[in-house]
Each structure stands twice: as structure tokens, then as C-alpha cells.
């Protein structure tokens, strides 16, 4: 033991007496390792006034993906200078192993640890942040009700914020800028700085950036932005980040009695977590139905209550919502919420999607004679009941109804179309179902006519102008039986996700236009309405252009390898 201590002391003496030139060489090598390729091309977010902003709306997210992939590849190559040849060129002996074992262990310091530098978020000054906040809560929040306004305004005024809060704020501003003619030029810069910061947080292994609700909210808003700009592939990647964070934080079982409520958590914080989960749930089902993908957030394992009534949420009244299974089967809803209705119709579409996928799997195993009638009829009965509740309990749809109410009405009709399509497919394997197939075709045609009327309402909507809201008045009598009542001063906006159910309807009509002349006529009428609906990406374009981009994206999915896609020439005819 004395010899070992003497040997350690000698080694420490050698380390302390290193030549200055060797230390300088080591520092230079460390500096070179930390100089990542591409740093010279990164924008300086702190010098925004002198920054040249992009002027084209056709910027491709794919370019960002390519450059990021090259960046990672080159970074990996430079951070691993040793090859197998260099490792094996020096013979390993017992003496060398003994010497290495006797050397003191020197822990890595931040100066010798290779890590990706955290990008700087773009900073806005003056009155622009306040204006973008106001634009967000006027134009985005009615359709994407994620945030508690008072809580956000409280922490947004603080000088020191969490990284995730900064990301959320910039995601909000990105969506607000997209829907503003005045600040539209800021959207690209805000979007890129926000996604870079979010990605850096996800890649951080230091533990200094714990995962939280604000990150999920930011990813969800970024997903909505990418969908509005028809970046469908990138939107799926972004929402996938939100899915993993939700699963990691177990937001699918926020109201599990066995887990309880964390100490110190208030109603508002818990409710924002619920809303983040359910918004991701809706997006998951929309992606799944649109592309025939498996559902990630399965309803069978969800133990989280539906969002509370919006007025209760904003007024901080701790009134809990129902569980999903209870709300779906309620004959009379406890309270009316367009957001909750959207969740329910998305769930029903997800069930039909699952039945169809299960049908194909069983067919592959030779189970061609399974009885699908019971599940089909049960789903049909629930769907009819929910459509009746929507028409009987909610006020008639008009221009003053708001984007969320219009969206859920479109979702309801598209749920009928999707359900009829799936049922017809499964009924073809059984004999004696011709009458039911005819009934499903008639129901789908009727629902398509409703969608056309709903699309016609969107032709009278502005892209940037929205409803000017007067403060809503509520009474105890109708607080839980009606949505907010606003005073209409301008025509309403289009829901950020409105194109998805409309495109599903158009796709159905296109694929069945040769089945019946009725479907061909409905397709022609719907496309005429699409020509009059303005695109938020480029107001000079219409939903015909949105549909072309939709089909261009769909051709890259596995589903389009088996089914025909819409011809662009036919759309523009």
C-alpha cells in the first residue's frame, strides 16, 4: 500500500510539472473540438434589427432537415478523431494496463465536455410582444384552448424565465404572426429560433432542463403552425416529441386515483396539463385517420378527465370535467364544450380506424368470417347520438359561432363519412348486406352535402380579420349549458385545422366519384367552394392549392402505395 501511495504521488507530481506548451496545445485541441461546423452560418438572434429576413413563403422545412443531418454527421466525425487503426496500432501490455490503473481519475469538466451549444432565442422589443400576446389570445386561443391567460401574463412579465417558457412564448408569437398581416414577416425567424431551442432542450443530458408542460404546449403549437403551412411531414415529427413527453410525464393518467395529486399543484396547473394531453390526443387521431396510421395515445389507457368548462378554467373555478367514457355515453351533457365534442368525435373516428386495421390483420391470418355487425352497429348508435346532441343542445351554426364550433360541426359530418366508409369495407365480406351498404352510401352522401354547406361558410371568412370580441356575460343558469356569447363585429377566422376534415371529405368523394353520379356532383360542388376559401399560407391561393399539397404529402405515405391519389390536373379543372 505504501508503494502504491508513493507511485500516485509521483504521477501527481508529473501532472503538476507539465510544460506550458503542452497545456496550451491541449487547450487549442479542446477549442477546436468545441468549434462545430456550421457555427459561422448560424444567425445572430441578438442582432435582429440588422438581420435580413426571408421574404418568400415557400421556404422548405426539408432544407432545414438536410442541413441538420449534415451538421450531425460532420459533428460526429470531428468528435471521434480516433479510428480502429489508431486504437490497435499501439500494443497493449500488462505494464501499460497497470500504469493506467494507477493514474488518478480526473472527472470531466464543462470545458472538456463536448456538447451542442444552446441556441439563442430571438428577442422582441417595444410593444411588439404585447401585441403578439393579444393577437394570440384573440385569434389562436379560441381554436386551440391550451393556456390560462392570467397565468401566462403573470410569468411572461418576469425578467427571468425558464427555457421552456421562452419556447412556449415564441411558439405563441409564431402562430400569432402567421395570422397577422402586420407581423407576418416575423413568423419564419420566430419559428426557427423556437424549434432550435426546443430541440436543444430535448437533446440535453445535463438535467438542467427538466421536461415540463410548457415544452409540450410549445411543441403542440409548433405542430399547428406546421400544419397550417402544409409542412405535414415535419408536423408529424414535432407532434411526436409532444407524444413522448406526455407519456414520460404520464399525462394520460392525471386523474388516476391510485396516483393522487402532487403536493402544491393547483387547479390551473393541472388543467393546463389536461388540455395539453387532449390537444395532442386530437392531433394524434387526425394524423391517424388521415394516413391510416396506428393511434399513439390509445383511449383504453387514458385516465385523465376531459377539459373543464372554459369559463371555469379562466375564472379559476375548480370544476372538474367528465371522463371520456362517461362523456361519450351521456344522454345529456353536463356542460357544453366544443373542444370536448371535438375530442369525442376524434375518438369515434379512432375506433373506426382501429376496427378497420384489426379487420385487415385478421384477414391476413385467414379470419375472413368474423362478425363485425355488433361493433359496427354500436359505433353507429353512439355516432348518431353525438350528432343529435350537437344539433339539439348547441345553438344553430352561423358566422358568430366561432372557429371551434364550425370545426367540430365539420368533424361530426366527416366522422359519419369515415364511419360509413369503414363499415362498407367490412360488410363486403358478408353476404346479405346490400341494403346496409346502400344505407351507408346514402348517409355518407348526406354528410358530404353538410360539409359543402359548412365549406361555403368559410368562403365568407377573412384570413387575417377575426371576430372582435366583447366581454361575454354569464349567469349561473346557463354557464354550463352554453358556450360563450360574443358580439360579432367582423367575420370570423378559419380554424387552424379546418383543412384536415375538409380534405378527408374531398378524398372520399374523389375515390367514389365513379361509384355514383351523386358523389361526382358533390365533388364538383366542393371543389368550387375550395376555390373561394383563402389559404393562410398565401392568401392569393385557395384551398385547391392546399389540397394539392395535401395529396403531394400523402403520396409519401404507405397508404398511397395501395390507393390512387387525386390528380392535380383534375383538381384545377
Swiss-Prot record:
This protein is called Ascochitine biosynthesis cluster transcriptional regulator
Q: CDD domains attached here?
A: fungal_TF_MHR (cd12148)
Cellular component GO terms, alphabetical: nucleus
Keywords tagged on the record: DNA-binding, Metal-binding, Nucleus, Transcription, Transcription regulation, Virulence, Zinc
Per the record, the major location class is nucleus
Keyword DNA-binding attributed: yes
The superkingdom listed in its UniProt entry is Eukaryota
**Cellular compartments annotated:** Nucleus
One GO BP annotation here?
DNA-templated transcription
One Gene Ontology molecular-function label: DNA binding
| PANTHER family in UniProt | C6 FINGER DOMAIN TRANSCRIPTION FACTOR DBAA-RELATED, ZN(II)2CYS6 TRANSCRIPTION FACTOR (EUROFUNG)-RELATED
**Cysteine-cysteine disulfides:** none
Could you tell me which InterPro entries the record lists for this protein? TF_fung, Transcription_factor_dom_fun
Task: List the Pfam families hit by this protein, alphabetically.
Answer: Fungal_trans
Q: What biological function has been recorded for the protein in this entry?
A: Transcription factor that regulates the expression of the gene cluster that mediates the biosynthesis of the mycotoxin ascochitine, an o-quinone methide that plays a possible protective role against other microbial competitors in nature and is considered to be important for pathogenicity of legume-associated Didymella species.
Amino acid at each position: 500500500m505504501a508503494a502504491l501511495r508513493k507511485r500516485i504521488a509521483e504521477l501527481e507530481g508529473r501532472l503538476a510539472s507539465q510544460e506550458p506548451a503542452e497545456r496550451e496545445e491541449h487547450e487549442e485541441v479542446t477549442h477546436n473540438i468545441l468549434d462545430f461546423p456550421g457555427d459561422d452560418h448560424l444567425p445572430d438572434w441578438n442582432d435582429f434589427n440588422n438581420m435580413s429576413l426571408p421574404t418568400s413563403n415557400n421556404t422548405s422545412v426539408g432544407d432545414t432537415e438536410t442541413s441538420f443531418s449534415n451538421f450531425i454527421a460532420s459533428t460526429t466525425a470531428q468528435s471521434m478523431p480516433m479510428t480502429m487503426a489508431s486504437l490497435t496500432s499501439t500494443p497493449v501490455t500488462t505494464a501499460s494496463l497497470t500504469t493506467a490503473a494507477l493514474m488518478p481519475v480526473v472527472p470531466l469538466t464543462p470545458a472538456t465536455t463536448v456538447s451542442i451549444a444552446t441556441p439563442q432565442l430571438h428577442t422582441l422589443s417595444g410593444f411588439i410582444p404585447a401585441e403578439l400576446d393579444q393577437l394570440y389570445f384573440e385569434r389562436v386561443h379560441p381554436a386551440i384552448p391550451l393556456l390560462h391567460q392570467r397565468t401566462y401574463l403573470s410569468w411572461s412579465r418576469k425578467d427571468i424565465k425558464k427555457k421552456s417558457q421562452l419556447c412556449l412564448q415564441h411558439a405563441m408569437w409564431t402562430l400569432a404572426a402567421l395570422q397577422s398581416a402586420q407581423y407576418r414577416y416575423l413568423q419564419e425567424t420566430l419559428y426557427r429560433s423556437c424549434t432550435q431551442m426546443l430541440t436543444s432542450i430535448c437533446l440535453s443530458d445535463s438535467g438542467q432542463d427538466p421536461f415540463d408542460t410548457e415544452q409540450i404546449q410549445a411543441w403542440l403549437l409548433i405542430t399547428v403552425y406546421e400544419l397550417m403551412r402544409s409542412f405535414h411531414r415535419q408536423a408529424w415529427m414535432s407532434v411526436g416529441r409532444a407524444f413522448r413527453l406526455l407519456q414520460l410525464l404520464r399525462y394520460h393518467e392525471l386523474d388516476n386515483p391510485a396516483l393522487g395529486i402532487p403536493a402544491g399543484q393547483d387547479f390551473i396547473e393541472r388543467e393546463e396539463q389536461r388540455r395539453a394531453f387532449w390537444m395532442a390526443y386530437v392531433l394524434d387521431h387526425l394524423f391517424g385517420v388521415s394516413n391510416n396510421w396506428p393511434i399513439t395515445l390509445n383511449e383504453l389507457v387514458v385516465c385523465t378527465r376531459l377539459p373543464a368548462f372554459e369559463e371555469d378554467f379562466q375564472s379559476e373555478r375548480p370544476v372538474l370535467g367528465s371522463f371520456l367514457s362517461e362523456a361519450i355515453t351521456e344522454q345529456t351533457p353536463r356542460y357544453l364544450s366544443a373542444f370536448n365534442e371535438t375530442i369525442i368525435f376524434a375518438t369515434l373516428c379512432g375506433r373506426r380506424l382501429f376496427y378497420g386495421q384489426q379487420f385487415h390483420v385478421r384477414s391476413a391470418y385467414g379470419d375472413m368470417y368474423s362478425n363485425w355487425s355488433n361493433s359496427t352497429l354500436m359505433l353507429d348508435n353512439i355516432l348518431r347520438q353525438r350528432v343529435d346532441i350537437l344539433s339539439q343542445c348547441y345553438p344553430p351554426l352561423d358566422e358568430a359561432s366561432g372557429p371551434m364550433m364550425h370545426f367540430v360541426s365539420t368533424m361530426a359530418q366527416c366522422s359519419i363519412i369515415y364511419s360509413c366508409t369503414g363499415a362498407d369495407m367490412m360488410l363486403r365480406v358478408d353476404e346479405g348486406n346490400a341494403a346496409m351498404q346502400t344505407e351507408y352510401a346514402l348517409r355518407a352522401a348526406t354528410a358530404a352535402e353538410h360539409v359543402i354547406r359548412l365549406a361555403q361558410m368559410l368562403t365568407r371568412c377573412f384570413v387575417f380579420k377575426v371576430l372582435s370580441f366583447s366581454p361575454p356575460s354569464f349567469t349561473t343558469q346557463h354557464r354550463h349549458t352554453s358556450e360563450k356569447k360574443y358580439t360579432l363585429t367582423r367575420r370570423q377566422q378559419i380554424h387552424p385545422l379546418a383543412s384536415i376534415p375538409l380534405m378527408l371529405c374531398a378524398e372520399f368523394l374523389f375515390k367514389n366519384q365513379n361509384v355514383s353520379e351523386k358523389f361526382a356532383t358533390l365533388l364538383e360542388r366542393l371543389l368550387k367552394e375550395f376555390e373561394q376559401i383563402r389559404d393562410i399560407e398565401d392568401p392569393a391561393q385557395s384551398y385547391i392549392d392546399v389540397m394539392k399539397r395535401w395529396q403531394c404529402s400523402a403520396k409519401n405515405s404507405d397508404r398511397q402505395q395501395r390507393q390512387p391519389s387525386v390528380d392535380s390536373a383534375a383538381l384545377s379543372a
